[in-house]
């Protein structure tokens, strides 16, 4: 019996020595270190880290804590309340996300809302990190990553906090904030490491916002690829999740198709270059595999383009009720958009309810490379329908010698702090381009009850996205046959019950309806704007490419230091990414040790020779 015990001890200690399991063991599962546990860093440990990263470490409280006792301060609460809608400010705050939903913790019933409505209500930490390394250099980020790895901490990466899936926050976590990595440099003839020149490109730090990139690119006479919202970080989850540009994607493709090189810090704290000539597997995974999953990206390099002339048309109309006349006009608007957005032209349309309850439609079309076109001529049928239905509308066209000057005008800069959930679907070309496609789409959408503030937003795809079918990256193959990305935004009150109610509505009611569009084969779902409780997310986000992503993550991050909600490998962990899910004894030592989460003695009894 003594020999057996010694053998068990050897097996147990050797498993720990591999360094591939978190250090806390609760009898059933291996967990990361949490506050209050012996393994949690001491104050001296945090102070030592702070000194090593030049004083950029801060202890974090939710931004709303100044509006709650015992730290209530009337003046500070008023100041934070005024700043709360500023997306740029929220991006810079370690204690904030862009969306309320991912500042609170439903599992712990913790929230800390901004505003003086109820100062006596306690402020819970929620999903806001305990500490943040607000790094200013790559070297500081490397030290922070090594610290998190050695201390077995729940690590989160926040770029700007634009994240509808909860990937930028986690309970009891240690955050690395990349907002201060702001370098932008243009390269006339970019040469990827170990490669030939590729033409004009831009290298940007992880903290560069869309509005910052667009403004500097315009100053240099370039057009850059980025998203619509001014306060999104281009090099973060935007490009690593795919990267849709409202104006440029049909002409140029997805941002993940274009990116030429990543500088990334690995789970071991090493700075590596990933491009098509070195670390090709990492390069493949970073282009569509999702942000914060296989490493911390410190900079990217991507091509820039010359001046692109553009005529941009904007049309909008409203209706007090969603009657037949309203939906008739919506159908014609989609037919016209579909017919116009070919040959590199692009478009976006919104259908929703305003704060007062009225229904609205907004359409923006980008006629790119065409200077002598008359958009009104292209939209004649829609304008006639609006007149026939006696619907008042606003329509204007603006010509821009350079699209970049339009992009440099910040969009959506003051929409931070909104409480909303998202859902989306990629609509396949076969459905959308059919004679009845737009009409059937509107009939489906009309079934959904919209509350004030709710809306549908559609971006046209196709074009170069489809033409890039041979680009080898982690993007779901469904992108190559999709015509439209349709996104639903659903507003809720800043209260946990309201948040839960809206989430249940999305997942149980609206989700199945969305998934039915284009049946029997809907294409895919965009991971950057997805239902937070989506089932089978691996298939919807990546399809047949998920297995390869798992393999690459196991190679580069076997301990899952980089873990995000509904990200590669997260199914092995609990909801908060704190403890590994328990596997059956049969699965344990048969799989790699980093997945060994079953009860130790059950594993030993199965796999120690002669024990049974």
UniProtKB/Swiss-Prot annotation:
It is an enzyme of class 1 (oxidoreductase). Glycans are attached at residues 50, 86, 109, 311, 396. Its EC number is 1.-.-.-. Notoamides have been shown to exhibit antitumoral activities. Notoamides A-C show moderate cytotoxicity against HeLa and L1210 cells with IC(50) values in the range of 22-52 mg/ml, but the IC(50) value of notoamide D is greater than 100 mg/ml. Moreover, notoamide C induces G2/M-cell cycle arrest at a concentration of 6.3 mg/ml. GO terms for biological process: alkaloid metabolic process. The keyword Glycoprotein applies. Residues 124-307 form the FAD-binding PCMH-type domain. Pathway: Alkaloid biosynthesis. Keywords: Alkaloid metabolism, FAD, Flavoprotein, Glycoprotein, Oxidoreductase, Signal. InterPro entries: BBE (IPR012951), FAD-bd_PCMH (IPR016166), FAD-bd_PCMH-like_sf (IPR036318), FAD-bd_PCMH_sub2 (IPR016169), FAD-linked_Oxidoreductase (IPR050416), Oxid_FAD_bind_N (IPR006094). GO terms for molecular function: FAD binding; oxidoreductase activity. Pfam families: BBE, FAD_binding_4. Transmembrane segments: none annotated. Residues 1-19 form the signal peptide. Its cofactor is FAD. Belongs to the oxygen-dependent FAD-linked oxidoreductase family. FAD-linked oxidoreductase; part of the gene cluster that mediates the biosynthesis of notoamide, a fungal indole alkaloid that belongs to a family of natural products containing a characteristic bicyclo[2.2.2]diazaoctane core. The first step of notoamide biosynthesis involves coupling of L-proline and L-tryptophan by the bimodular NRPS notE', to produce cyclo-L-tryptophan-L-proline called brevianamide F. This is FAD-linked oxidoreductase notD'.
